[in-house]
Amino acid sequence: MSYKLPLFAAAAFLGGYMLISNRQLRVNKYELKVSKLPKNFVGKKILLLADLHKKRYGDNFNNLVNSCIAAEPDFIFFAGDLYSRDETDMIPKLALMKRLKHIAPTYYIFGNHETDNMDNAEALALKLTECGVHILRNNMEQIKIGEDHINIYGTQLPQRFYRNEDFSHHDLPQIKKDELTKLLGEPDRSECN
């Protein structure tokens, strides 16, 4: 009998820790060395966000937005899963993206949760474009500073790379270079991509 209380306490602590750590905003800083980076891009900061799903990070995303402002990014990239596949109300997330766009030019790539429902994905793409967010869906865009530019690419992968028809995630195919080339085209190797 005496072992049940410590076991329960340990399980409760571990469960609470996992819940909290999964909901905390985490900031990682990396410095990248890019050989063909044009001089006007040296020292520029990119803020990468991803997998927001149902998280809010404060009322109206205020903690998230304040962290983004504090980072002083030159560009914001959102790498998919702005919402979860079962969410239907896009208004709060669109308001967040508008706020991010006012911090720095913002670029968006769809994740697997967005592409689970292509009607929602198309509506989201239209609304994001209307508010000035750049959408990367199997295309390249140039980011320019002065006379310098870099090329950025974004894919919208088919669902077969995210899950099987039975919604399982085992033995998923790896995307191959020729498939990426088919989606994005061949990069200009003389430029910064």
Pin down the residues of each PLM region:
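N-terminal membrane-anchoring alpha-helices
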Residues: 1-40
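Short, mixed charged/polar active-site loops
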Residues: 27, 43-45, 149
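Hydrophobic residues on conserved beta-strands that form the core of alpha/beta folds
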Residues: 27-29, 49, 152
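Alpha-helical scaffolding within the catalytic cores
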Residues: 27-34, 93-95, 135-140
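Short amphipathic alpha-helices and their capping/turn segments at secondary-structure boundaries
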Residues: 33-37, 63-71, 141-144
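Conserved catalytic scaffold of divalent metal-dependent phosphoesterases
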Residues: 36, 54, 114-193
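Residue-level preference for short coil/turn positions at secondary-structure junctions
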Residues: 41-42, 72, 102, 148, ...
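Membrane-embedded segments
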Residues: 44-134
